[in-house]
């Protein structure tokens, strides 16, 4: 099983989520939309929170703090099962997007497109509110 970590980067005090802009799709998945939650694979021996910090640093150039696992989803992609762990946290710093991310957008839930990679906007709203409840 492949374990993917999708990160829900919360911009503290703004009610906004930072989404990655990936022109031409991500891993060849252009049909899944232009905006994605930053994501990557869980490395051998790595904890999900550590992976989330690494992914946000490597893809957006930002720090991620207060990480919490807020959701999971299993899906069959091609010939392999993927387990997606959604880890939320607060971002800080100046963004510096790196490949495969071509840009980013800080958006409120109402401003998000319907589809964020493998996640629908309604899923992201539930996960975001779960993060807020867990951090309270």
Provide a role label for each language-model segment.
Residues 69-74, 106:
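Hydrophobic/anchoring residues in structured secondary elements
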Residues 11, 86-90, 105-108:
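Short, well-ordered beta-strand micro-motif
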Residues 32-33, 96-136:
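Nudix hydrolase/Nudix homology domain
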Residues 37-71, 87:
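The catalytic Nudix box helix
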Residues 1, 31, 77-83, 98-101:
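A generic structural micro-feature
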Residues 73-95, 123, 130:
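Active-site-adjacent beta-strand/loop module that shapes the phosphate/pyrophosphate-binding cleft
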